[in-house]
Amino acid sequence: MTWPLPDRLSINSLSGTPAVDLSSFTDFLRRQAPELLPASISGGAPLAGGDAQLPHGTTIVALKYPGGVVMAGDRRSTQGNMISGRDVRKVYITDDYTATGIAGTAAVAVEFARLYAVELEHYEKLEGVPLTFAGKINRLAIMVRGNLAAAMQGLLALPLLAGYDIHASDPQSAGRIVSFDAAGGWNIEEEGYQAVGSGSLFAKSSMKKLYSQVTDGDSGLRVAVEALYDAADDDSATGGPDLVRGIFPTAVIIDADGAVDVPESRIAELARAIIESRSGADTFGSDGGEK
């Protein structure tokens, strides 16, 4: 059979190249069709002028519970001091046991999530086995590092990786949360929770206080939704539950059975319960604050 693209190298002609390179979809595409990659990852020059007028997405939270992990994200995107979107999806299932949530420049974040999912699927198709969790971390770190030039010009997108390590010796502690910096450095969270985005400080403070209540997936989901509610209370770029429009955070639960999207009806139920409990609190005491 003749290779149909004379202006590009065939797979078999990549002499001297380790075969493992072919298991990376990003590396393969960079060789065969670099124009199909995002400019930052393909090595092209990022747009001048930074990202002052580009939509941004925040906030993402993740927390572990015995036997799994929960990841949730708000729905708001901002453009400077304006709200550019109210129903943005920021949490994606990337394979059977992994999910990513990415905060930052919306366009870059979405490209990251989609390309990472294809990267994992491509590896499994070629090698016949899925990547180990450590391998998944390294692949995402390489992608983040490839975006460094764009990040230095303001097109920053930071992922949060959550997953279930099927090779863990103890299934009850197999939930994993990994955070990344702009240079591709990564850290496996040992505290049991993490957040990224402009509201991450407030979300982490909320989870720190509530984490002792987490005993299973359902209680973990409630704490994640409540953390986003607290973040939205103090961070204008984070959107809380919108009862009027019927817009609620999105969430993924990952355990030994795999990763599943939490139904919107369940998140709405939890959000309403949280708002009702906060609204019902007697802030000023039994006399309403009057003498």
Curated annotation (Swiss-Prot):
Q: Name one GO biological process term.
A: proteasome-mediated ubiquitin-dependent protein catabolic process
Q: Where is this site: Covalent link with the inhibitor MLN-273?
A: T58
EC numbers for this chain: 3.4.25.1
UniProt propeptide residues: 1-57
GO CC annotation terms, alphabetical: cytoplasm; extracellular region; plasma membrane; proteasome core complex, beta-subunit complex
Q: How does it assemble?
A: The 20S proteasome core is composed of 14 alpha and 14 beta subunits that assemble into four stacked heptameric rings, resulting in a barrel-shaped structure. The two inner rings, each composed of seven catalytic beta subunits, are sandwiched by two outer rings, each composed of seven alpha subunits. The catalytic chamber with the active sites is on the inside of the barrel. Has a gated structure, the ends of the cylinder being occluded by the N-termini of the alpha-subunits. Is capped by the proteasome-associated ATPase, ARC (Mpa).
Q: Using the UniProt record, give the first listed, main subcellular location.
A: cytoplasm
What does this protein do, in the record's words? Component of the proteasome core, a large protease complex with broad specificity involved in protein degradation. The M.tuberculosis proteasome is able to cleave oligopeptides not only after hydrophobic but also after basic, acidic and small neutral residues. In complex with the ATPase Mpa, degrades protein targets conjugated to a prokaryotic ubiquitin-like protein (Pup). Among the identified substrates of the M.tuberculosis proteasome are the pupylated FabD, PanB and Mpa proteins.
Q: What is this protein called?
A: Proteasome subunit beta
Which lineage is the organism of this entry classified under, starting from the top rank? Answer: Bacteria, Bacillati, Actinomycetota, Actinomycetes, Mycobacteriales
Molecular function terms, GO-annotated: threonine-type endopeptidase activity; zymogen binding
